[in-house]
Amino acid sequence: MIGENLRFALGDFWAEFRKNRAGMVGLALVILFLAAVILEPRIIPFPKAGATWHDITAWDDNPPSAPPQWINRFTEKKAAITSVVTQYEKTSEQSDSSTLVTYTFSYQDPYDVPPLDLIVHFVAAGDVPFAVSVVRPDREEVPLYQEQRQAGTREDVRVSMDRNSASALFDYLKGYESEDTLSSVDPGQLKPVQILFSVAEPGMLKHPRPLKGMYQVKLQGLLLSDASALDNPYVVFTGRVSGLLGTDNSKRDLWSGLVAGVKWALLIGVLTSFIAVAVGVVYGIVEAYFGGLVNAILQRIWEVMVNMPLLPILIVLSAVFKPSIWFLIVIMSAFFWVGPVKTVYSMALQIKEETYIEATRALGAGHGRIIFRHMVPILVPYSFASMALSVPAAVVYEATVSLLGLGDASIVTWGQILHDAFSGGAVLNGLWWWVVPPGLMIAVMGMTFSFVGFAMDTILHPKLRTR
């Protein structure tokens, strides 16, 4: 019987809820946020972004402060997009005492602005002399780097051509530029990758023209013994634009950071509002049920708490103690519970005068049974609406604390991204893709639960429908 009544009640609620356009928009956004949490590893290019966000070395292959790649649609000159090439052709040449392995990667360059860097990754073991060269579209092969690698065990090797091939490209320029031009150039200040992707002609140093077409990157390694190895190679072409939302000045992918922050925003908002509303509902019922001295004492406590400024207290406590997401949730819950108390109190005053409450008391039911079995269930629908309306405040408070640099540094939140943006000079340098998206996400998250909360409030309180 109870299950059937619940089913009909939920059916009636849904029939009313789906008529509310704002509520349906909010519900759709909630589903979208939940889908982002569930599908996070599949929809971001860096699935471990949450764990490595504060590990700057994990983002070395990205360009710093790069705009989103879709910006190319609105510019005359198309900038190179960051690309990872994992497909290769492998050849081996065996001799009596060694083996020469060659990995060839193909990269089509249709861009007007060349990549920032060309980075070669592989795993090496033992004594492995290796060399990197590039065959340009004009069929000229340019040697870039070589090294005698000695590794006792297998280790990851990363070679950046922007950092390691300046001397090789300076030698390459000698075939095209005059001695007077070269004498005025410091080899250490060259931009090797820009030269590599330019038409080979006199004047290419000062006025480079893009050389478009197919480039082939060759990685050659000489395996001197059975213990030597060179495998798992791939090449990264670090572009001038990167990802759906660009990168920050630490080369971190902002799309990955925003998606990784969704789960923390939901956790902060939902858990804080759940704890606060649960405490507030019980507090208001107890205050109304007992009345008298209990009511007077609880009323004084409520008046003290409701007049205490939460944000300054949060800032001071976060500065004194080690910032933690759980610490913030507890502190916010300790202040948010005052929100629903007065409404619950007024409703509970009416409920406790109902005939069935008097009958339950006459049958010998205890105070706890009356409160939790007969009064709390009646106020549960209101509790859900109050919870939804409390979520935006929790999200904004956390973002404010993080914006001041006092958030939990072990996770990724939108407030932290905004803090990094302001401390990194994003506004002054016009890096709008670093500031606007996290701000919009905070606003949309707040709007989402406000829509749902107001829709539920309107349905569960019929007098509000005329508002």
Predicted regions and their residues:
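Alpha-helical transmembrane segments of integral membrane proteins
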Residues: T247-R467
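Gly/Trp-centered helix-boundary motif
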Residues: M1-G269, A421-G439, A443-V444, F451, ...
